[in-house]
Amino acid sequence: MRVLVQRVSSAAVTVEGAVVGAIRPDAQGLLAFVGVTHSDDRDKARRLAEKLWKLRILADERSASDVGAPILVVSQFTLYADTAKGRRPSWNAAAPAAVAEPLVTEFAAALQGLGADVQTGVFGANMQVELVNDGPVTVLLEL
């Protein structure tokens, strides 16, 4: 499982013209793109959620748990792109939707269980993601 996390001052996910999840402007938070591979399980999802919740990448070396920062979770199978051969990425390392969707849901639920204010995109949808990257700070978490 991979989580590409960006510190943001605002972010929004839109599906079919409607905003489905957002971090309001000037409310420093985290945008977490979540990719799932075949060997991932619920335990990995929970451990990565805890790692993200306590990751000290906000202002003054604080974590989302320290300041109650909002987290926007967006599924992102392309985090498992293989570009080693040719010019067209392979997605073979990405888990199929039947495996990935429950694990992305588990990841978001684990964050909520830790006390996070979590919003999400829509799994499998064509999403438009807008964000203002703060710093910029972008970190790849992987288990």
UniProtKB/Swiss-Prot annotation:
SUPFAM superfamilies reported for this sequence: DTD-like
GO biological process, one term: D-amino acid catabolic process
Major place of residence: cytoplasm
Residues spanned by motif Gly-cisPro motif, important for rejection of L-amino acids: 135-136
A molecular-function term among this protein's GO annotations: tRNA binding
Keywords assigned: Cytoplasm, Hydrolase, RNA-binding, tRNA-binding
Function: An aminoacyl-tRNA editing enzyme that deacylates mischarged D-aminoacyl-tRNAs. Also deacylates mischarged glycyl-tRNA(Ala), protecting cells against glycine mischarging by AlaRS. Acts via tRNA-based rather than protein-based catalysis; rejects L-amino acids rather than detecting D-amino acids in the active site. By recycling D-aminoacyl-tRNA to D-amino acids and free tRNA molecules, this enzyme counteracts the toxicity associated with the formation of D-aminoacyl-tRNA entities in vivo and helps enforce protein L-homochirality.
UniProt similarity note: Belongs to the DTD family.
Subunit structure: Homodimer.
Name the UniProt record assigns to this protein: D-aminoacyl-tRNA deacylase
Source organism per UniProt: Mycobacterium avium (strain 104)
Gene behind this protein: dtd
